[in-house]
């Protein structure tokens, strides 16, 4: 008998930065990957060439979320994991209607994972004890709050709470955890002054890069016991 093909890992927002790094990590392990993307960055073509299934999706509406879920349901009979990496960053600022800011942040960080977890639940079940995973990417600000990104922090806090609720709902077949990062890597346009200020916010005074996230994701995927937890990835920032 031939070797059974592994079930794919679904990564939302997999076209750039951490999502892209995770996609390549799994591809290099011969792990099938399904990636959602909103904007067709050149990196998407590389993922497709490497064998990833890339599905364009618009998570700004519930209809867009459910249309994406339908595409996933058509494409596979099961999932190894869902990594909710898709995110947006919007501040309260003059000229931006507060209702729009809150609605946008809640849509991408709460509605989207909530609807996808429900719609794709059957793809995660039936594979054995602790055989499947959901990982929510939240944020360090869940613990501290943010005076400049109030809606963003609130939406990530709601996602953090959903981690525990879905862990209760889906155990023991599916483990559900969240990762709460602070600074992981800089943007190309960040200047030296900003970078130094950001580094000084943590005890470790470094931006560790995508590998730190990948290692933590691997830990959660291989654990048979950890569920309903938020794992901080902040370099001791809470002690500053």
Curated annotation (Swiss-Prot):
Gene3D superfamilies: NAD(P)-binding Rossmann-like Domain. Its EC number is 1.5.1.50, 1.5.1.3. The active site is at 152 (proton acceptor). The keyword Oxidoreductase applies. Keywords: NADP, One-carbon metabolism, Oxidoreductase. It catalyses: (6S)-5,6,7,8-tetrahydrofolate + NADP(+) = 7,8-dihydrofolate + NADPH + H(+); 7,8-dihydromonapterin + NADPH + H(+) = 5,6,7,8-tetrahydromonapterin + NADP(+). PROSITE patterns: ADH_SHORT (PS00061). It is an enzyme of class 1 (oxidoreductase). It comes from the Bacteria. GO terms for molecular function: dihydrofolate reductase activity. GO terms for biological process: one-carbon metabolic process. Belongs to the short-chain dehydrogenases/reductases (SDR) family. FolM subfamily. PANTHER family: DIHYDROMONAPTERIN REDUCTASE (PTHR43639:SF6), OXIDOREDUCTASE, SHORT-CHAIN DEHYDROGENASE/REDUCTASE FAMILY (AFU_ORTHOLOGUE AFUA_5G02870) (PTHR43639). Catalyzes the reduction of dihydromonapterin to tetrahydromonapterin. Also has lower activity with dihydrofolate. This is Dihydromonapterin reductase. The gene is folM.
């Amino acid at each position: 008998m031939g070797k059974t093909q592994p079930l794919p890992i679904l990564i939302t927002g997999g076209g750039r930065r951490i999502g892209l790094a995770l996609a390549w990590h799994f591809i290099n392990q011969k792990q099938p990957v399904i990636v959602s993307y909103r904007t067709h960055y050149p990196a998407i073509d590389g993922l497709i060439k490497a064998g990833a299934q890339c599905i364009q999706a618009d998570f700004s509406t519930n209809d867009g979320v459910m249309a994406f879920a339908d595409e996933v349901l058509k494409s596979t009979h099961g999932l190894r994991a869902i990594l909710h990496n898709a995110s947006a960053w919007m501040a309260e600022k003059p000229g931006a209607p507060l209702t729009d800011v809150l609605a946008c942040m809640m849509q991408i960080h709460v509605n989207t994972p909530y609807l996808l977890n429900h719609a794709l639940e059957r793809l995660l079940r039936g594979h054995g004890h602790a055989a499947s995973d959901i990982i929510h990417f939240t944020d360090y600000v869940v613990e501290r709050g943010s005076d400049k990104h109030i809606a963003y922090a609130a939406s990530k806090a709601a996602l953090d709470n959903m981690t525990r609720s879905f862990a209760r709902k889906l155990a023991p077949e599916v483990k559900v955890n969240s990762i709460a990062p602070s600074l992981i890597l800089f943007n190309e346009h960040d200047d030296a002054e900003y970078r130094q200020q950001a580094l000084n916010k943590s005890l470790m005074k470094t931006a560790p890069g995508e590998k730190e996230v990948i290692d933590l994701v691997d830990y959660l995927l291989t654990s048979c016991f950890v569920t309903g937890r938020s794992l901080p990835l902040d370099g001791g920032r809470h002690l500053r």
